[in-house]
Amino acid sequence: MDTHGEKMKNLEIKKHSRGDLLLLRSSDLHSFRKLQREVDKMGLLSSAEQHLSGILTTLENVADQDNTLYCLTQRGELIGMLKIGTKRLYLYNGKDLHCRSCACLLDFYIRRDFRKRGLGLELFNFMLRDKAISPSRLCYDNPSHKLRSFLKKHFSPCALIKQPNNFVIFAEYFGEPEAAPFER
């Protein structure tokens, strides 16, 4: 079995913001197109695994919608991704409906042949540190059973509450002081 050091060998996490992608597209179209092919392929895999008709994540929609994409690579090959962005949502706390600008996890995918190695947790924790946010302050866009299990395993105890808009929040979401949406 791999040790943690061996698992993380040759791995890199890269953050791509809208500005980064627009700059890459204008300055190095070849590199942009290569990244686009990899991200679009992984977005297709993510959507297929969730039985969705459309693709949640393409490089174009990351740039167009002002989201942030975290890419996990091994020896330059994309093996995982996490997309996060800000959405204006109506959230129900059990009594009242609140309209807020919320930090949202929009897509999260690790290639099948790289799962069960702790790499998803590494990627998720990298994003949390980068955005200076706790998992309970995120809204999760229609999370799959696998993502719900991941959250319960790594951030237990956590009770997840489904919202009418198909987002899911932690039960303590409203118990914490409201923070400003993260900086992009």
Curated annotation (Swiss-Prot):
**Belongs to which family?**
Belongs to the acetyltransferase ATAT1 family.
Protein task? Specifically acetylates 'Lys-40' in alpha-tubulin on the lumenal side of microtubules. Promotes microtubule destabilization and accelerates microtubule dynamics; this activity may be independent of acetylation activity. Acetylates alpha-tubulin with a slow enzymatic rate, due to a catalytic site that is not optimized for acetyl transfer. Enters the microtubule through each end and diffuses quickly throughout the lumen of microtubules.
Q: Where is the N-acetyltransferase domain?
A: 1-174
Give the source's domain of life in one word: Eukaryota
Against InterPro entries, the record matches this protein to: Acyl_CoA_acyltransferase, Atat, GNAT_ATAT
GO BP term, example = regulation of microtubule cytoskeleton organization
Which Gene Ontology molecular function entries are recorded, alphabetically? tubulin N-acetyltransferase activity
Q: Which HAMAP family match?
A: mec17 (MF_03130)
Residues marked Crucial for catalytic activity (site): 50
Q: Which residues bind acetyl-CoA?
A: 108-121, 144-153
**Which reactions does this protein catalyse?**
L-lysyl-[alpha-tubulin] + acetyl-CoA = N(6)-acetyl-L-lysyl-[alpha-tubulin] + CoA + H(+)
Query: Which UniProt keywords are present, listed alphabetically?
Result: Acyltransferase, Transferase
Can you say what this protein is called?
Answer: Alpha-tubulin N-acetyltransferase
Q: Which Pfam families match?
A: Acetyltransf_16
EC no.? 2.3.1.108
> What does the entry list under GO cellular component?
microtubule
